[in-house]
Amino acid sequence: MVKVEKFIPNAIDRIKEQAKGKTIIALSGGVDSSVCAVLAYQAIKDDLIPIYIDTGLMRKGETERIKEIFADMNLQTIDAKDRFLDALVGIKDPEEKRKVVGETFIRVFEEEAREINAQYLIQGTIYPDRIESDGGIKSHHNVGGLPEHIDFKGIIEPIDDLYKDEVREVAWALDLPEEICERMPFPGPGLSVRIIGEVTEEKVDVVREANAIVEEELLEQFKPWQTFAAVIGKGTGVKGDVRVHGWIIAVRAVGSRDGMTAEALELPWETLMKIESRISGEIASVARVLYDLSPKPPATIEFE
C-alpha cells in the first residue's frame, strides 16, 4: 500500500520539476483527476489551469455537479458535445472509438493550451490503465488512446504508479470530500464504451438514463466497486399489445479491490426485478434488460 506521508510531498516535487510554466489539467471530477488537481495546485499554484471538457458522454447531472464542486478552482468548462458525437459517427470498433475520443479530447485541450499559452498537460493515469494498455487488453484514452503526435512539451502523470484504492487513500489524506474520495470509477471515453457498436445521440440518452437508474438502486445499499448499464443491441419486445424492436440493456455490478480482477455481485432477485421494471418502464425504447455475471478475467469490467 502507498505511504501517503511520503507519496504526497514526492508527487508535489515531481510536478514542480516537470511543469515549467502554465499547465492545464484534465479535470473530470473523478478521484484520479481530483487528486492530481490538488497535488498540482499545491505544487504550482496559479500556474495550474483546470479544464473540464463536456464531451456529451458523461453521466446524468455530472457536468452540473463538477461545476459546483470545483467552482473555487477557476475551473474552465468547454462544451464540446457536438464535436465528440460528430467524430464518433460511423465508428463501431471499440478500439477505434477509444482512439477517436482520446484524439478529440487531446485536440480540444491543445486548442485551450494555445489560448492560455500552456505547454504542459497533467493527467490522472493510474497503474491499471498502463497495465491494460501495455498488455494490449484495451487502450485508455489517456494512455494508448492518445494520438502519436502531441503539441504539449510534456504530459505529467503524478499518480501513474498507484492503484485505485491507493488513490483513494491519497484523496482522504488531501482532505478531499467523501463524494470524490469514494466516487465510483468511470471510463475516460465515458458512455461511448457502454454502447456496443456506433455511438448515436439516441443511444447516449438511453444509456445515460439507464445508468442513473442502476446507480440509484445499487450504489448506497450494495456499495459495488463499479456498477452501470450498457446498450448492447436491439431485440424484440412487447409494449402493451404492440410488438416492438427496442434496445437491450445489460446491467453490470462488480466487487473488486483494485480493478485488476472483479466478481459480479450476487444481488437479490427483488433488486434485479426492480431495476428491470424501472429501466423498461421509464425508458420507452428499451425492450429487454439483462444482468451480466461475468468475472474479470475473462471479461473486462466495461463492455468495451
From Swiss-Prot:
It comes from the Archaea. The keyword Transport does not apply. Its EC number is 6.3.5.2. Keywords: ATP-binding, GMP biosynthesis, Ligase, Nucleotide-binding, Purine biosynthesis. One of its GO terms (molecular function) is GMP synthase activity. GO terms for cellular component: cytosol. Pathway: Purine metabolism; GMP biosynthesis; GMP from XMP (L-Gln route): step 1/1. It is an enzyme of class 6 (ligase). Residues 2-183 form the GMPS ATP-PPase domain. It catalyses: XMP + L-glutamine + ATP + H2O = GMP + L-glutamate + AMP + diphosphate + 2 H(+). ATP binds at S28, G29, G30, V31, D32, S33, S34. Heterodimer composed of a glutamine amidotransferase subunit (A) and a GMP-binding subunit (B). HAMAP family: GMP_synthase_B (MF_00345). NCBIfam families: guaA_Cterm. Catalyzes the synthesis of GMP from XMP. This is GMP synthase [glutamine-hydrolyzing] subunit B. It comes from Methanococcoides burtonii (strain DSM 6242 / NBRC 107633 / OCM 468 / ACE-M).
